């Protein structure tokens, strides 16, 4: 990339093609630039990507975009000092892309009173552009049976980088557990969208016995085993919630790729996936 003007033009073109904002495309590109540094670092086996950034890679930027990167750490201490040291070392890995990264700050992530990990703020610098980025780092996640080596396809080059990642069964299991256990208290419509889009675009890759095992492991870790048994009633309660429908309508307005999908369709995706697991005794 010769200069920022050239990069901006490419980002605008991609934004038009994918129907998402140029800023969001740019953030995804810069997160990818960070990920290449991870792949070349001594921490490549410790840093396991998950969440929206990984889902976006699986289904395409035109079907899912995100503003941050979620990862879980394995085989390395997850304290504030250790995480900061790891990220700062990753940022020094030489890559021929003329982008430099600045570590800004790190802080605990809390959901209520519960500590869930660390949030790291970075800036990706490609003068005169300075793009703010966010990494959410956790540890102790239950990956069933284990993380995989994932070929991440680059946005602007015809090549892949190899990184460690959640497998599809665990991604889907965590999403299913979240939407069912949180019922109509879930404030994140994207969780429903992710179940919908993964079951549509990755249908041929879903291993239902593996998904059942991953869902049982996730539910056991989160203490939601009994709640998941009531999935039919919970999905219907969610389907009939005016608040949840309003949240979904707002999500559809914000993201063009969700604009034609009804709330009933995403609820159906959750229910039918669970039906398949229960009917075949893959989850009990």
Model-derived regions: residue spans:
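Structured mid-to-C-terminal alpha-helical surface segments
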Residues: 1-47, 56-65, 69-284
């Amino acid at each position: 990339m010769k200069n920022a003007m050239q990069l901006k033009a490419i980002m605008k073109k991609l934004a038009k093609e994918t129907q998402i904002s140029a800023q969001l495309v740019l953030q995804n590109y810069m997160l990818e630039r960070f990920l290449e540094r991870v792949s070349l670092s001594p921490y490549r086996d410790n840093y396991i990507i998950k969440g929206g950034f990984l889902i976006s890679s699986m289904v395409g930027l035109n079907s899912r975009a995100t503003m941050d990167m979620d990862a879980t750490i394995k085989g390395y201490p997850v304290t504030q000092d250790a995480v900061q040291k790891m990220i700062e070392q990753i940022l020094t890995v030489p890559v021929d892309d003329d982008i430099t990264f600045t570590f800004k700050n790190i802080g605990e992530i809390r959901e209520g009173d519960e500590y869930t990990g660390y949030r790291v703020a970075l800036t990706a610098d490609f003068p005169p552009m300075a793009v703010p980025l966010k990494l959410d780092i956790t540890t102790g996640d239950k990956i069933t049976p284990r993380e995989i080596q994932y070929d991440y396809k680059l946005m602007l080059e015809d090549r892949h980088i190899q990184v460690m990642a959640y497998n599809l069964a665990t991604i889907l299991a965590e999403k299913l557990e979240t939407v069912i256990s949180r019922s109509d208290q879930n404030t994140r419509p994207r969780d429903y969208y992710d179940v919908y889009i993964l079951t549509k675009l990755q249908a041929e890759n879903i291993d239902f016995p593996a998904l059942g095992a991953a869902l049982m492991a996730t539910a056991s870790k989160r203490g939601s085993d009994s709640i998941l048994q009531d999935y039919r009633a919970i999905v219907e309660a969610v389907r009939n919630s005016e608040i949840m429908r309003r949240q979904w309508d707002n999500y559809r307005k914000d993201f063009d790729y969700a604009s034609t999908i009804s709330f009933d369709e995403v609820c159906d995706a959750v229910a039918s996936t669970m039906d398949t697991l229960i009917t075949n005794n893959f989850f009990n």
